């Protein structure tokens, strides 16, 4: 398992130059319950509609949603749809937009009519002119793209065959990127992969790959065999074939093919899922990820995207929830720092009629004695809060050589235990302030204490709570473990 948080932080430091066919996506949702008396066609009773940035613009949105910066260059007409797109893009944080206008063509617009009940697309209406851009517009696009290469860590070309990525534009951008040492990721539309020659990675879907290679490759082995000629033709590092529910297969120029299965999810809408895949792939590769890490990120992002309605983008937080094991995330969510958050969690439990318990300690090296106390404490309540001494607090109590593990490591170990429901780090020598905040119904302490010696007993008893003392498990102590380790190391 790769470190998602480290990779996510690296992604946030990247800038992706994204170029491609911009579209305005509109989704009209409604119910269908009858057939038109005028013609054998269903009648949709419209309930709502949504406007989204589509095409390469959705790729840019996905890049920004991951936390990376995006420089986006696209082509629009001189019409209302262009104004809508410009306004929508201006509202997107993390995207620097450069739009080239061509008054001779309409802004590409797609309207999809969707059955709300069945989440099924019934009809799509397109406004577009798919002809290649004129020579003048090509030059304006090149002039907008090439000077911005220096600010990018990677280049992403999203080709929907609507006229932006002509052979001339592709050649100028790819060649300039290679001279600048920048990798180029291409989501291709043309079956002639040679026009993308020199790109780093091509990402066709299964249909596009079959058309480009004139093959019916189905298995991983067949895809790998068919991809070799295509890799040579396009002079690229690798080809990634996306295969919907079958997952995705990457074939590198050198080395074995890598197949990553799809996540099992309920598919609500596939619109824009390919945009999500290529955006995540580019951002993760820019951040220094290897092939397999990038593919696993892209596969998880696709699963999130298809579970949403409409043209979807995927945030870093959503991706994190999909990739990290539930147990890891559940443990992580137990560690809370701020008083406000602690109080909100505790009050929430209390409002449900749950009995809140509290215990505390340094828990420097977790051992069976600790586990006994924690388990007994949890058995005495419905939710257990563990107060954990901070590093500075441990050092004052135990000496300069302690703690052995820092407070974050100690908190993570505690949070992984089923008996523990919340871990709160305190900086004082005693947990009295934390006990006053939590006001537990049960205060548990292990060791040779009397009730009067337990810090916070007055607070708990004044509120009608009880103090429970747990016998220590003899032969187990952190100090003894540390001393033994040091003597063995001499």
Curated annotation (Swiss-Prot):
One Pfam family this sequence matches: PfkB
GO molecular function, a single term: heptose-1-phosphate adenylyltransferase activity
GO BP annotation list: ADP-L-glycero-beta-D-manno-heptose biosynthetic process
Record-level GO cellular component terms: cytosol
Pathway(s) served: Nucleotide-sugar biosynthesis; ADP-L-glycero-beta-D-manno-heptose biosynthesis; ADP-L-glycero-beta-D-manno-heptose from D-glycero-beta-D-manno-heptose 7-phosphate: step 1/4; Nucleotide-sugar biosynthesis; ADP-L-glycero-beta-D-manno-heptose biosynthesis; ADP-L-glycero-beta-D-manno-heptose from D-glycero-beta-D-manno-heptose 7-phosphate: step 3/4
Binding site residues for ATP: 205-208
Positions of the UniProt region annotated as Ribokinase: 1-330
EC numbers on record: 2.7.1.167, 2.7.7.70
Keyword Nucleotidyltransferase: yes
Sorted UniProt keywords: ATP-binding, Carbohydrate metabolism, Kinase, Multifunctional enzyme, Nucleotide-binding, Nucleotidyltransferase, Transferase
Region (Cytidylyltransferase): 358-490
Superkingdom classification of source: Bacteria
CDD domains recorded: RfaE_like
Reactions catalysed, as given in the entry: D-glycero-beta-D-manno-heptose 7-phosphate + ATP = D-glycero-beta-D-manno-heptose 1,7-bisphosphate + ADP + H(+); D-glycero-beta-D-manno-heptose 1-phosphate + ATP + H(+) = ADP-D-glycero-beta-D-manno-heptose + diphosphate
InterPro entries associated with the record: Bifunc_HldE, Carboh/pur_kinase_PfkB_CS, Cyt_trans-like, PfkB_dom, RfaE_dom_I, RfaE_dom_II, Ribokinase-like, Rossmann-like_a/b/a_fold
Catalytic residues identified in the record: 275
Family: In the N-terminal section; belongs to the carbohydrate kinase PfkB family. In the C-terminal section; belongs to the cytidylyltransferase family.
Xref: HAMAP family: HldE
Subunit and interaction comment: Homodimer.
NCBIfam families: cyt_tran_rel (TIGR00125), rfaE_dom_I (TIGR02198), rfaE_dom_II (TIGR02199)
Function: Catalyzes the ADP transfer from ATP to D-glycero-beta-D-manno-heptose 1-phosphate, yielding ADP-D-glycero-beta-D-manno-heptose.
Protein's name in the database: Bifunctional protein HldE
Organism: Bradyrhizobium sp. (strain BTAi1 / ATCC BAA-1182)
Organismal lineage: Bacteria, Pseudomonadati, Pseudomonadota, Alphaproteobacteria, Hyphomicrobiales
